[in-house]
Amino acid sequence: MEKKNAVIVEAKIYKVFDLWKRKPKCLTFNDTDVIIVTAEAKGGEKIRETFFTCLKADGTFSLKTPNQIAESRRQKLAKFLTYYKFTDSPEDYNLVNNISKWKNKEVKIVRDKGENYIFI
């Protein structure tokens, strides 16, 4: 897979019910927050990556959860944070306070099955 460079132009945290009237069936009870990262490649092509998690009151999240599907979603977020060097300790990283620092950070994108994704 060929990796291309892109730059994060927007990163926001939403509550699930800010985006949907009913929680999508694929989400578990403890998937309460959504992080949407928008990156732009050369030529203006925009790529969106979505991360589901459950933020604690202090803005951090836990990798451990009773549900394996929710845990794998959180692992994806943790890999993103460590791969792009936002933090070495994802569970101690305050997403609420630090998400604004993601803007203009360079990321890699890959094309798979006709879709572009942020490489993690």
Predicted regions and their residues:
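Short beta-rich binding modules
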Residues: M1-I120
